[in-house]
């Protein structure tokens, strides 16, 4: 009987957790202040999302940047997840750098603001 109650509680918890959808919060920034022609790291940190069905791409003028690195998917309290993707780059004047995030059926693009 105890096993049945435990299983039932597990099922209720599973359904409750699976039923909550949270949109991602996205931050796009660089490791150092942006300076044209100087090597830097472009970072896209995505947090607070559920379920963990997500794709992150770093872009230069709409094209996917190669040689990116991605952290392992991790979760926070409340079963919300976070993930970070980064790449080494040299900002060029007139180029647009961005992070594309697809979560579930929603896709958004977030631009990097170099503050130069």
UniProtKB/Swiss-Prot annotation:
Heterodimer of an alpha chain and a beta chain. Beta-2-microglobulin is the beta-chain of major histocompatibility complex class I molecules. The keyword Thylakoid does not apply. Belongs to the beta-2-microglobulin family. Disulfide bonds join 44-99. Component of the class I major histocompatibility complex (MHC). Involved in the presentation of peptide antigens to the immune system. This is Beta-2-microglobulin. It holds the Pfam family C1-set. Its main location: secreted.
């Amino acid at each position: 009987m105890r096993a049945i109650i435990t299983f039932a509680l597990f099922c209720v918890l599973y359904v409750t957790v699976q039923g909550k959808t949270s949109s991602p919060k996205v931050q796009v920034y660089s490791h150092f202040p942006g300076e044209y022609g100087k090597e830097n790291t472009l970072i896209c940190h995505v947090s607070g999302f559920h379920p963990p069905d997500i794709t992150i791409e770093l872009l230069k003028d709409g094209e996917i940047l190669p040689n990116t690195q991605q952290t392992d998917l991790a979760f926070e309290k409340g079963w919300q997840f976070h993930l970070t993707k980064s790449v080494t780059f040299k900002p060029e004047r007139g180029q647009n750098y961005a992070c594309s995030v697809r979560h579930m059926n929603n896709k958004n693009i977030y631009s990097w603001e170099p503050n130069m």
